A protein has these predicted regions:
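Surface-exposed binding/hinge segments that line
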Residues: 116, 132-189
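Ligand-site clamp/hinge motif
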Residues: 229-274
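N-terminal lobe/hinge region of extracytoplasmic solute-binding protein
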Residues: 38-89, 207
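Extracytoplasmic/peripheral linker and loop segments enriched in polar/acidic and small residues
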Residues: 85, 356, 409-422, 449-516, ...
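Long beta-strand-rich cores associated with HINT superfamily self-processing modules
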Residues: 513-551
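Gly/Pro-rich hinge or "lid" segments in bacterial periplasmic/extracellular proteins
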Residues: 168-237, 241, 251, 545
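Structural transition elements
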Residues: 331-371, 391-393
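Ligand/substrate-recognition segments at binding pockets and active sites
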Residues: 361, 365-440, 455, 511
């Protein structure tokens, strides 16, 4: 088996060599200070106003820099801003000074106007940003996005070249972390206007102000970064290169690790035991949850609450994560993930929710019986869209077997699609059911719960609940200064969502990584971008096999 895996790695490397992996050094070369990482899917854009998925966000976190970034404790720290915001007494006006040495990779200075331009672009209805709702706390953002006010009325103003004023609809306790999101990053107006709709579609149609810049992006193959010599803090960036290899097959990623072709790779469930004694193996639980979206618009039967509940309860999730992943993933019965935020008492918010969606074959059958009676039919058929990866294929087969075994008369078909195509179908509401996931962008339950409100671009299930919408509105408004009441309101909202079951939670994502012990300073985040690579360096005095100092 090991010989076969090695042959796979050699084959992959050979293909890369023949096609010319980069302009200078091979994608897999470990010469100098280079970090080589396998990623499970490609990014979709380099335009921060259009980003909706985790890989684009993660790469953006290395090549762009906003007012703030997340530290290793997932708290905001100054980046382009010189310090945390100065707040008015009512907490609704922020004054932010910018560092004068921040530059774009074309040499232009990063100015307050770059933030004004980018934020206005996000909420401009012409942009069609799926993340415009993230800016709802900024004064007039929702009205601008709805076309009811001009973009100039957005609550951001350049007081001078290096000073910003931000006006909020309401005081927001997590505003510093919110401003660390990629959606709030600046854009160079001159460059963005030059390329128009093509901005960010290729490596050379963008400029960068982060620690690194993209020099090579070959779709569904690789992304290569180099150190940004115009970055204000370049003297503290030790890596000269970052190479991402797109691989949908985790077994192939392990093969590349074994041949010293990459420094970090997620491995498949069946490989975990093989590496259980390896210094390279580490498991981490992310705050990402995976669930089945049930589209009531395309499948009218999904309007029946009992059918939705039956599907949620019919899946043995503990058995699923054990047999399919073996990587630290958790069976999930909640929508808001563990690790997202804490209650005023210091408890994990997710731990305070008693979900009705636990696996229960008997209850699932009872719900299905009620659904059949109310629907007046004994059979329901729908298609589940999943990503075209080996693990998602296995996942779909497992879910299909559970639903069809425990709910006789329900037939689930499976359609595998490239990630971008699957996502676009979701956003267009052109799907029946979709195996989807969500990672919180800031440390608050609303990072999840907001996405299921009526009209939210991520809520493409056609489910709508007025009470739920009001609870989220109150939590984002009048209750922001009342921690206890706000927490109780969000708990109630989560319970409504789970009892209505417009989505069927399946698992909270874990990852089993093989990481080169020479890699130092690597930070993983529970919220926001997956990693921070600014402080990473390769300590070649460490033995890659043992993790100990070389003799």
């Amino acid at each position: 088996m090991r010989k076969w895996i090695t042959l796979i790695a050699i084959f992959i490397i050979s293909l890369c060599t023949l096609s010319g992996c980069s302009n200078s050094k091979s994608l897999y070369s470990d010469e100098g200070q280079v970090f080589r990482k396998v990623i499970p899917q490609d990014m979709t854009t380099l335009d921060t106003t259009l980003m909706t998925e985790s890989v684009s966000s993660d790469v953006a976190g290395q090549v762009f820099e906003g007012l703030y970034t997340m530290d290793k404790r997932d708290q905001a720290e100054p980046a382009v801003a010189t310090k945390l915001p100065k707040k008015s007494k009512d907490g609704k006006t922020l004054t932010i000074n910018l560092r004068k040495d921040a530059k774009w990779s074309n040499g232009d200075p990063v100015t307050a106007n770059d933030f004004v331009f980018a934020w206005r672009k996000v909420v401009d209805p012409k942009t069609g940003s799926e993340f415009a709702y993230i800016m709802s706390d900024i004064k007039n953002a929702d009205q601008v996005n709805a076309g009811k006010k001009p973009v100039k009325d957005l609550g951001i103003k350049a007081l001078n070249k290096y000073k910003l004023q931000v006006k909020l609809e309401r005081p927001v306790p997590y505003i510093n972390e919110l401003l660390a999101l990629n959606t709030f990053d600046p854009q160079n107006e001159k460059v963005a206007n030059k390329y128009g709709k093509d901005y960010g579609t290729t490596a050379d149609k963008a400029v960068y102000n982060g620690p690194f810049k993209v020099v090579n992006w070959q779709v569904e193959d690789k992304i290569q970064l180099v150190k940004n010599k115009d970055y204000w803090d370049k003297n503290n960036v030790k890596l000269s290169r970052v190479n991402y290899k797109v691989l949908k097959d985790n077994q192939a990623g392990a093969a590349l690790y074994d041949t010293n072709s990459v420094d970090d790779a997620i491995i498949a469930a069946e490989q975990v035991d093989k590496y259980k004694n390896s210094i390279a193996l580490n498991k981490r639980l992310t705050a990402g949850t995976f669930f089945i979206k049930l589209n009531e618009k395309q499948v009218p039967e999904f309007k029946n609450k009992h059918l939705r509940l039956a599907i949620s309860k019919a899946i043995n999730k503990k058995q699923y994560v054990k047999s399919v992943f073996n990587d630290g993933s958790l069976a999930s019965n909640n929508f808001t993930a563990f690790g997202t935020s804490k209650t005023p008492e210091g408890k994990d918010f997710a731990s305070t929710i008693n979900s009705p969606l636990k696996y229960n074959e008997k209850e699932a059958k009872e719900n299905w019986k009620k659904a059949k009676k109310e629907l007046g039919k004994k059979k329901v058929t729908f298609t589940l869209n999943v990503q075209d990866t080996p693990v998602q294929k296995i996942s779909a087969e497992y879910i299909k077997s559970q639903i069809e075994k425990n709910l006789p008369g329900v037939q689930m078909k499976v359609k595998q699609l490239p990630f971008k195509q699957k996502t676009n179908l979701e956003l267009a509401n052109n799907y029946e059911a979709s195996y989807s996931g969500w990672v919180p962008d800031y440390p608050d339950p609303t990072a999840f719960l907001q996405t299921m409100t009526t009209g939210n671009s991520q809520n493409n299930t056609a489910w709508s609940n007025k009470e739920y919408d009001k609870l989220i509105k109150d939590a984002n408004g009048k209750l922001l200064q009342n921690e206890d009441e706000r927490n109780a309101t969000l708990q109630k909202a989560e319970r409504i969502l789970l009892n209505e079951a417009p989505v069927a939670p399946v698992y909270q994502k874990g990852e089993a990584h093989l990481t080169n012990p020479q890699v130092k300073g690597l930070v993983y985040h529970m919220v926001g971008p997956d990693t921070t690579l600014k402080d990473v360096y390769i300590d070649k005095s460490i033995d890659r096999e043992t993790g100990k100092k070389k003799k």
